[in-house]
A protein has these predicted regions:
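Gram-negative/organellar outer-membrane beta-barrel architecture
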Residues: 1-92, 106, 159-160, 166-171, ...
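Transmembrane beta-barrel strands of outer-membrane/channel proteins
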Residues: 1-4, 19, 35-41, 89-97, ...
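Extracellular/periplasm-exposed beta-strand and loop segments of Gram-negative cell-envelope proteins
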Residues: 10, 48, 59-65, 197-210, ...
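Outer-membrane beta-barrel architecture
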Residues: 18-22, 73-75, 92-94, 112-114, ...
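Residue-level signature of outer-membrane beta-barrel architecture
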Residues: 25, 76-78, 97, 115-117, ...
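Short loop/turn motifs that connect adjacent beta-strands in outer-membrane beta-barrel proteins
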Residues: 28-33, 80-89, 102-105, 118-126, ...
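Extracytoplasmic gating/loop element in the C-terminal half of outer-membrane beta-barrel translocons
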Residues: 122-245
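C-terminal beta-signal and terminal closure region of outer-membrane beta-barrel proteins
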Residues: 152-160, 247-301
């Protein structure tokens, strides 16, 4: 079982198993097509204290799902190196579909782009990145699965905001609900008040969104006191992004697709390659901050 509450997102547990096969076909020296086929069985475990959005989903769609998923990925890469590129670009488009006949049917699409170019005679490097994502239900499924939502915020996303915390917040009902979304009743037939309402374990945790817009600009420069720059990269950055819902209802920190709700940040970042893997830190200030956004002036990962 996986408990996702530790990732700053709405708390729930799930059991999932499956099997799949992958194919890859080079189209040219720089382009590739991939095809993934996977069968997946997922069980969602909800409780009386689960977020109301999760209870609403399970009331509409159930808690047990079997799906046959197909995913097509196209990529085009002209980067001059895999780590710390200084020129070229990479693009990828991914479309995942749970095929008709599955117990839950949805489509999930993403587009990612990175671009690097030396400027001022190669003394500096311009870096640009962007990502957009869309999640939609189709067929008999009315609500897109919350466990496929997009998340934003963090040192690899929109720096200056805590990881996975941007966008709609998980909310709870004033009264305790069962897995069908119905209020539980006491011995007198009265609805049972939720003692955790207003300060539950889901407070300030994101439920994610069905739309993602994210991007960043990096002005990459060398550190003058380091002779070997191959394992270190520093930059001034500007990031922007957020996740959005289809219908906000009474969700907090929520907006439907609106570029005016993009969050911004700027600052200085540093990444270095160690024997344990890449390490990153950022000093950031934020812009267009919402009242419930969780910010971090210093981040390390």
């Amino acid at each position: 079982a996986s408990d996702y509450g530790q990732y700053n997102i709405a708390s729930y547990t799930s059991d999932s198993y499956g099997a799949g096969i992958q194919f890859g076909l080079p189209i040219s020296d720089i382009e590739r097509i991939g095809l993934n086929l996977r069968y997946e069985s997922t069980s969602i475990d909800v409780g009386a204290m689960s977020a109301s959005q999760i209870l609403s989903f399970t009331a509409s769609e159930g808690t047990e799902f079997e799906a046959l998923k197909t995913q097509v990925i196209w990529s085009r890469i002209t980067l001059n190196r895999g780590i710390f590129p200084t020129a070229g670009q990479s693009q990828s488009v991914g479309i995942e579909l749970s095929v008709p006949g599955s117990s839950i049917t949805y489509a999930r699409a993403t587009y990612r782009h990175r671009y690097y170019r030396p400027i001022f005679g190669g003394k500096f490097i311009l870096g640009l990145r962007g990502e957009i994502g869309v999640l939609e239900a189709y067929g008999d499924t009315k609500v897109p699965p919350f466990y496929e939502h997009f998340y934003a915020g963090g040192i690899t996303s929109v720096r200056g905001f805590r990881a996975n915390t941007l966008g709609p917040r998980a909310t709870q009902s004033e009264y305790i609900l069962d897995a069908e979304g119905n209020p539980l009743l006491d011995s007198t037939g009265q609805q049972i008040f939720n003692p955790y309402w207003g300060y539950s374990r889901n407070d300030d945790r994101s439920i994610g969104g069905v739309y993602l817009i994210e991007g960043g600009f990096d002005f990459i420069f060398r550190l003058p006191f380091l002779e070997d720059q191959r394992s270190v990269r520093t930059s001034f950055f500007i990031d922007a992004g957020n996740v959005f819902a289809q219908n906000c209802g009474n969700e907090e920190n929520c907006s439907e697709l609106d570029l005016g709700e993009l969050r911004y940040s700027y600052g200085i970042g540093l990444t270095w390659i160690t024997q344990l893997g890449p390490m990153s830190l950022a000093l950031a200030a934020v812009g267009n901050e919402g009242p419930l956004d969780r910010t971090e002036g210093f981040q390390f990962e």
